UniProtKB/Swiss-Prot annotation:
Sequence ranges of Basic and acidic residues compositional bias: 208-224
Name assigned to this protein: DAG protein, chloroplastic
GN (gene name): DAG
Example of a GO cellular component annotation carried by this entry: chloroplast
Task of the protein: Acts very early in chloroplast development, being required for expression of RNA polymerase beta subunit gene, and hence indirectly for subsequent expression of CAB and RBCS genes.
Note: Expression detected in the dark, but enhanced by light.
Pfam family, one: MORF_dom
Reported tissue expression: Expressed in leaves, flowers including petals, and to a low level in roots.
Entry keywords, A to Z: Chloroplast, Plastid, Transit peptide
Gene Ontology annotations of biological process type: chloroplast RNA modification; cytidine to uridine editing
Listed Basic residues bias regions: 197-207
Organism of origin: Antirrhinum majus (Garden snapdragon)
Primary location class: plastid
Length: 230
């Protein structure tokens, strides 16, 4: 995955309280202190089904650290999203496109990457709680903020992001669930349009018109005979 959709608001962001212009100027530089971002969507966006907000904070920035680089003297706000506890992390990875890996190969890569950081495959299977090979290419794991730094620089690792809820009500981080080696596919909601009441009534009216009136109403009236008229 070479590109990332950064269409949503930041997950953990310390924006200027007066204007967003400094943020835009920072994003245009090559050296970034923080980046607003969302789960990458190289194939399709899931933001339509799950309105969520995410952001990237690198190893030099977090909401819990003092902002020593703020030379403006202006007070800055901290925005924390539900589920963002710096113990749940999203590791976004990129894969070659030609040939593209299979789903199984991508899952193996996720586990091997996590095992490299945690020291064993057993620990990797215990700490990976979700992943995706479609809406984004990456996995989610429970590690400390300090341990999350170890992912940086590993082969294929593109982003290391604090994870946050996609479904706040159910405290769901999204993705296909991974529980001790068992994969539970994510059930994405589907849109089913409701049938219009007016169209239903129109359909019934059409049937009545097509069938016509009852037989006794269709009988022609008998013409009056000369005898009856006299």
């Amino acid at each position: 995955m070479a590109t990332i959709n950064l269409s949503l608001l930041p997950k953990t962001l310390t924006p200027n309280s007066k204007t967003l212009a400094p943020l835009l100027s920072i994003l245009s530089t090559s050296s970034l202190s923080f980046l607003p971002c969302t789960r990458p969507h190289p194939i399709k966006s899931r933001s339509a089904a799950y309105p969520t907000v995410r952001a990237l904070t690198d190893g030099e920035y977090s909401s819990r650290r003092n902002n020593n680089n703020n030379n403006s003297g202006e007070e800055r706000e901290t925005i924390m999203l539900p589920g963002c506890d710096y113990n749940h992390w999203l590791i976004v990875m990129e894969f070659p496109k030609d040939p593209a890996p299979t789903r199984e190969q991508m899952i193996d890569t996720y586990l091997n990457t996590l095992a490299t950081v945690l020291g064993s495959m057993e620990e990797a299977k215990k700490n990976m709680y979700a992943f995706s090979t479609t809406t984004y290419t990456g996995f989610q794991c429970t590690v400390t903020e300090e341990t999350s730094e170890k992912f940086k620089g590993l082969p294929g690792v593109l982003w290391v992001l604090p994870d946050s809820y996609i479904d706040v009500k159910n405290k769901d981080y999204g993705g296909d669930k991974y529980v001790n080696g068992e994969i539970i596919p994510c059930q994405y909601p589907t849109y089913q349009p409701k049938q219009s009441r007016s169209s239903k009534y129109k359909s019934k009216a059409y049937v009545r018109q097509r069938d016509g009136p009852p037989a006794e109403q269709r009988r022609p009236k008998q013409e009056a005979t000369p005898e009856s008229s006299t």
